[in-house]
């Protein structure tokens, strides 16, 4: 039995990195005494896979991991027992069974992610930036230099921006999130303001991931 677990990560837990989040859930699953399936071999480990890693300092209302169970049990019981082990800022949103024939690694199912970017108090630019978004998106290309592990390369951001909408105090984004074209909302935001001639101060805005999944544009 494979289940897909949706969880939120807010408050102090946003400073816990991806690898530590994985370890956190491994410990929580053991404390919950759930019948989790393990791999074979000399070093068995829980059979689980997480979706797109969340950056340190970013909150999320919709993150996922897939978990292989050694035996069937009600998803409501899995959710309740795991929720009892959650610390402040971490919450189990839902647990659902992955139907036979549709199982797969959570990461492989991700094509897009929704984000909310909001300016911190006193950090919103004083210039009229909201009226410039349509013009920014109308560009056939949005070239930026992306830093990789070994070098720099120029990429076109425009195909990776599925949605960019103005909110009262920031932006709503739907951005590409597959492993081949993962796009950070911070990069899009800073690129936009650089394009209109406004450089944002450090820590000008917060980022919250709302949901991940297939692109629904």
Task: Annotate each predicted stretch with a short phrase.
Residues 134-216:
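Core RNA-modification/binding signature centered on pseudouridine synthases
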Residues 6-8, 12, 16, 20:
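Extended, well-folded interaction surfaces typified by the phenylalanyl-tRNA synthetase beta subunit core
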Residues 77-86, 128-137, 188-189:
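Short amphipathic alpha-helices in soluble, non-transmembrane regions
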Residues 37-69:
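Short, charge-patterned binding micro-sites
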Residues 61-116:
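Ordered, amphipathic secondary-structure segments that act as subunit-interaction surfaces
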Residues 7-9, 67-73, 117-123, 173-177:
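Short beta-strand-to-loop capping motifs
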Residues 102-121, 159-163, 214-216:
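Short, low-order "capping/linker" segments at domain edges
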């Amino acid at each position: 039995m494979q289940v897909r677990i949706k969880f939120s990560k807010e408050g102090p837990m946003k400073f816990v990195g991806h690898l530590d989040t994985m370890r956190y859930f491994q410990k929580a699953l053991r404390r919950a005494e759930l019948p989790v399936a393990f791999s074979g071999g000399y070093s068995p480990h829980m059979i689980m896979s997480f979706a797109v890693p969340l950056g340190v300092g970013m909150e999320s209302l919709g993150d996922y991991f897939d978990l292989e169970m050694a035996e069937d049990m009600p998803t409501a019981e899995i959710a309740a027992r795991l929720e009892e082990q959650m610390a402040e800022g971490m919450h189990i949103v839902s647990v659902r069974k992955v139907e036979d024939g549709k199982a797969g690694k959570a990461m492989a199912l991700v094509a897009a992610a929704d984000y909310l970017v909001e300016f911190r108090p006193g950090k919103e630019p004083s210039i009229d930036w909201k009226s410039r978004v349509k013009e920014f998106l109308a560009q056939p290309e949005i070239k930026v230099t992306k830093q990789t592990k070994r070098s720099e390369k120029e990429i076109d951001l425009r195909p990776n921006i599925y949605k960019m909408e103005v909110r009262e105090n920031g932006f709503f984004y739907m951005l590409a999130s597959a492993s081949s074209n993962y796009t950070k909302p911070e990069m899009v935001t800073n690129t936009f303001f650089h394009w209109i001639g406004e450089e944002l101060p450090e820590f000008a805005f917060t980022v919250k991931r709302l949901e991940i999944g297939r692109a629904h544009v």
